C-alpha cells in the first residue's frame, strides 16, 4: 500500500499502525482517524511521517502530528476534501468558532486544534468534528458532558442510533479487510 523499501522496519511499523487504526479513512468512507503512536527516535519518526505522507498524499490522505511528547505522538490521518466540506458546514463552524477557531481554512483549523490540545487541561470535545462524527452527536456529547448517550461505538451516539450502529459495523468490516490485505 505504501511502497516502502524492504527491511525498513520502523516505517513498516508506522504504516501497519496507520492501516490498523485508519482503514476507514484510507478507504474513503470516513473523514479522519486519530491514534497514539510511540517512537524511539524523533529524527526517524519525522522521516517516517514525511515518507508516509508522500505516499498517502497522492491518494488524497494526509497525516498531521497534532501533539508530540518525548516518545509518543498523537497522529491525525485525514482526507482534506472531506475536512474542507466539514469546516464549511455552518453547523460545524458554529461549534468550532465558539471554541476560538477564527479561520475556515483546513490548515488554520488544524493549527487551532493543535494549540487547544497543548493548552487545554481536557481533550477538546470539538475534535469529534475533525473525525467526521455527526454534528448533533458532538453537540449533545458536549452538552451532556459525555453522559446519557443511546449507545457507544466509534463515538457516543445521541441521535440516529440504528444508522450509527450500521456505520460502526461498516468501519469494523473495513478495518478487518484492510488488516487482512495489508498487514
Language-model segments: what does each one mean?
Residues 1-37:
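Short, extreme N-terminal leader segments that mark the start of a protein/domain
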Residues 2-6, 97, 113, 161, ...:
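Intrinsic low-complexity, intrinsically disordered or marginally ordered coil/linker segments
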Residues 22-28, 63-67, 114-119:
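Short, flexible, solvent-exposed loop/turn segments with mixed acidic/basic and small polar residues
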Residues 48-105:
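A glycine-rich, hydrophobic loop/mini-helix early in the fold
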Residues 105-121:
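Helix-hairpin-helix/helix-loop-helix acidic hairpins
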Residues 124-149:
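Hydrophobic/aromatic-rich, well-ordered segments within soluble, folded domains that form packed cores
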Residues 154-183:
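Long, compositionally biased
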Amino acid at each position: 500500500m505504501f511502497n516502502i523499501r524492504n527491511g525498513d522496519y520502523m516505517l513498516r511499523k508506522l504504516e501497519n499502525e496507520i492501516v490498523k487504526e485508519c482503514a476507514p479513512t484510507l478507504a474513503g468512507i470516513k473523514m479522519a482517524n486519530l491514534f497514539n503512536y510511540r517512537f524511539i527516535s524523533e529524527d526517524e519518526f519525522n522521516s517516517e511521517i514525511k515518507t508516509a505522507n508522500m505516499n498517502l498524499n497522492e491518494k488524497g490522505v494526509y497525516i498531521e502530528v497534532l501533539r508530540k511528547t518525548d516518545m509518543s505522538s498523537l497522529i491525525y490521518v485525514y482526507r482534506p476534501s472531506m475536512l474542507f466540506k466539514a469546516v464549511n458546514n455552518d453547523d460545524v463552524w458554529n461549534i468550532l468558532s465558539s471554541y476560538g477557531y477564527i479561520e475556515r481554512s483546513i490548515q488554520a483549523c488544524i493549527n487551532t486544534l493543535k494549540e487547544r490540545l497543548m493548552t487545554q487541561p481536557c481533550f477538546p470535545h470539538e475534535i469529534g468534528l475533525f473525525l467526521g462524527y455527526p454534528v448533533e452527536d458532538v453537540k449533545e456529547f458536549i452538552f451532556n458532558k459525555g453522559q446519557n448517550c443511546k449507545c457507544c461505538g466509534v463515538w457516543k451516539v445521541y441521535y440516529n442510533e440504528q444508522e450509527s450502529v450500521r456505520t460502526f459495523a461498516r468501519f469494523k468490516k473495513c478495518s478487518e479487510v484492510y488488516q487482512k490485505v495489508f498487514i
